């Protein structure tokens, strides 16, 4: 999927180890469209994309992303994550 919008927020780098022992680096960014009724989303950059992110608030970008879903341990609540895999 594609999403084009301007950057409204750039989060800090976050590092953690997964349950499988993999070290992961992430950074969240918020994008908003320039339409009459703007759409917005919180997108996650991982590893190299998160570390090498060199854009600024206000810049317009197009991202390609996947949607993943996870649940809490009880399986009663679902969370969606928008994972960027390319920035144009």
Task: For each feature predicted by the language model, list its residue ranges.
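Single-stranded nucleic acid-binding surfaces, predominantly the OB-fold ssDNA-binding core
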Residues: 1-88
